[in-house]
Amino acid sequence: MSVYTHLSDDEFFAFCGLFGVTFKKAVPITQGIKNSNWFIQTDSDVDDEFSHVFTLFEERSVADITKMVTIMHALKDKLPIAPPLVKLTATGDDIGSDCVMRYENKAILVVPKLLGTHPTTTNTAMCHTMGQALATLHKTLQTLQPAENYGVPLYDWARVKERETAYMPTDEARLMNDIWAAYANLPHDLPRGLCHLDMFADNTLWDFSGDTARLTGLLDFTEVSVEHYLMDIAITINDFCTTWGSARDGESVNFNTDKMMAFIDGYEAIRPLTDNERTALPVMLAYCATIFWLLRLNVIYYNREQGRTGDDIMVKNPDLMKRLASLHWTKI
């Protein structure tokens, strides 16, 4: 979450007032790479407490965010999420319209701030919990039919791939193309449905106060779309089961198969995998790493094209995902 669009205190005050939230202060959130986000402090909050999160969606259309609101309200009784606040003037006829505001034709939502912190490391118990959570999400969203009416359009990663591979070193372009060719040959009957598609550790919150970490929040539902469930599984495994080194240690990438097995065990406690899904998982892990390699390159491209600079802009290193893709590919 970064900040690309800037609002005045008067604008924050007016928007928050639509939900009965008494605005006092907004503080930019700099994690993430797609939308403009702020913590909101109200008159009821004390010291450095913040009780709400204010998000202005930079890329997704108002129609897409309206779908997302429906999805989040469908999940609110099954998983720890923060459903968007409903306006004081809500009629109850359309949950999307009751929650979504607009600024220069961009959608805005206000949600309660969930308790917990982002994990800096994970363990097998946390991976097991995440497997259960993702399977619960998949099963719960099967109630929204037809699923295509609720998912947002998938991004055209093939176009990004063509642009980026044209400038890559030969070995990197070959790696990308080989993995994509293997993905194209996967069985076409892999189960599909509404998927989160961005369930990284920094999109989760945890309570670490007890002996066992407790999942307290799932965040960022802007990418929910109809895809192979296995893709959602692979995306989540790739982050939760990988230790990302810092710049100090050369930004190493270490994948932990014990964590992956714990994740799969948790997932299958809710939704068993098919034989084809099990067979396809290694290729899907490599393919999903290339997608996030391309995503990070794409963010750099658009930041450069649109002149986005400053301390409030976050860019994640694409080379980490390239290394993860290569690591998975060597095992296939």
Task: Mark where each language-model region is.
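Conserved NTP-binding catalytic cores of kinases and kinase-like/nucleotidyltransferase enzymes
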Residues: 1-85, 208-213, 330-332
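An alpha-helical support segment within catalytic cores of ATP-dependent transferases
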Residues: 5-19, 146, 158-197, 201, ...
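Active-site acidic catalytic loop and adjacent metal/ATP-binding pocket
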Residues: 33-50, 54, 85-86, 183-231
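ATP-binding pocket architecture of kinase catalytic cores
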Residues: 41-145
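A glycine-centered beta->alpha junction motif in the catalytic cores
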Residues: 91, 106-121, 160-165, 290-307
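A cross-family kinase active-site recognition segment
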Residues: 120-170, 190-192, 226
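Active-site activation/catalytic loop segments of kinase-like enzymes and analogous catalytic loops
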Residues: 230-271, 287-304
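ATP/Mg2+ or Mg2+-diphosphate-binding catalytic cores
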Residues: 292-332
